[in-house]
Amino acid sequence: LVAGELAPAAGSIACSSRPYYVPQHLSAAGISAVGVLGVADKLDALRAICGGSADPRCYDILADDWDVEARCRAALDHWGLPHVGLTDPVDALSGGERTKLCLAGISVHNPSVILLDEPTNHLDTSGRRRLYDLIRASRATIVVVSHDVALLNLLGTTCELSAKGLKVYGGNYDFYRERKRIEEEALAQQVDSEQTALRLARKKAQEVRERQERRMRQGERHKDQLPRILRRTMKDS
């Protein structure tokens, strides 16, 4: 929804700038590296201009981003992809290389909002280290969905999504786990207290019923005894 791939069923999502999205699984059929990086049109415009074109549309597309090709090349090299050409097809890359290619786009675009969906699933050790370093150094708003505890501990806020809705915890994953432990212990104590109170209430109700039953039995005995007392009194008189 935040990435804009799905429309919300109700309400709306507002973002100050277009988020940069790194998907868990990249559909790569027929896409080149620059297509994944989102700069194919700019590179085409740059090459047209360098080839002598004076078409104003090319200048509009490039938007004075003259070093876009150099940034792309530097980003691929940084992520351990020096062997990947900008026009190479992505379907020839491994899962880890595709993830690195998507992550390289962060350096190309320098976005203010980054969405990462299970980004370390296919990364090797060096790739994970580069990602951790990126997150430590970044000033962007980064939203991560991950099972990687080391990654989650680099983030300042943890959100838990459940059937009850979204709950925000003001800390990293270790902080979240500690808060959850405290909440679960408090809930267990509350349940235990409620069960104890219920047992006491049932015991009290049972005692009340037993007292009422004793009084009723005593009342019945008094009724049975009253006629005999009256007859005995009449005989004595």
Region roles according to the model:
Residues 114-118, 123:
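Catalytic Walker B motif of ABC-type/P-loop ATPase nucleotide-binding domains
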Residues 30-40, 161-199:
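Conserved beta-strand-loop-alpha-helix hinge in the C-terminal portion
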Residues 1-59, 147-148, 156-163:
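ABC ATPase nucleotide-binding domain signature region
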Residues 52-67, 82, 186-237:
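Flexible nucleotide-interacting loop at or near the entrance of a catalytic core
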Residues 25-95, 101, 195:
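ABC-family P-loop ATPase nucleotide-binding domains
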Residues 134-144, 152:
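Conserved catalytic loops of ABC-family nucleotide-binding domains
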Residues 110:
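Conserved catalytic motifs of ABC-family nucleotide-binding domains
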